[in-house]
Amino acid sequence: DEGHDPVVARSKLDWWRGEGAAMFHGTPQHPVSRALAPVVADFALPESRFGEIIDGMQMDLLQTRYLDWKALHLYCYRVASVVGLLSAEIFGYTNRQTLKYAHDLGLAFQLTNIIRDVGEDARRGRIYLPIDELQRFNVPARQILDGQYSEDFRKLMSFQAERARQLYDQ
């Protein structure tokens, strides 16, 4: 995520995807996966969740913009909600609502990070705010990339903050 060669980063993620599969099939090589394997087995953590996290990381390599909330939601789910869902399994949740809460809290955390990091992400050529919402609030992408924040931008950010608040409250 921090300015690495995308080809190298993608290769590393592919390697970790394979290593994750190896962990679930009893043949991990890396010390981290060897240490994690018994935890995964003890808590019956689903293999698919680990793949979803890597899918989210790959989205960071392949995408710099998201068309709408649905697309951004998927990214937030993969990089944050899935971590909460895995944590709920480890903590031994007993109420099914815990999974919905973990899902929504992950979305809220990631959206909060996106709001916090708008300037930093823009300096790296990324805008995580949905394109359709930029258009709805009349905020050109160039304005964000140039670090120029208008009243329309403030309204857009208020909208995002309210969305995050609602996710925290669910």
Residue ranges and their predicted role:
Residues 1-169:
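Acidic catalytic motifs of isoprenoid enzymes
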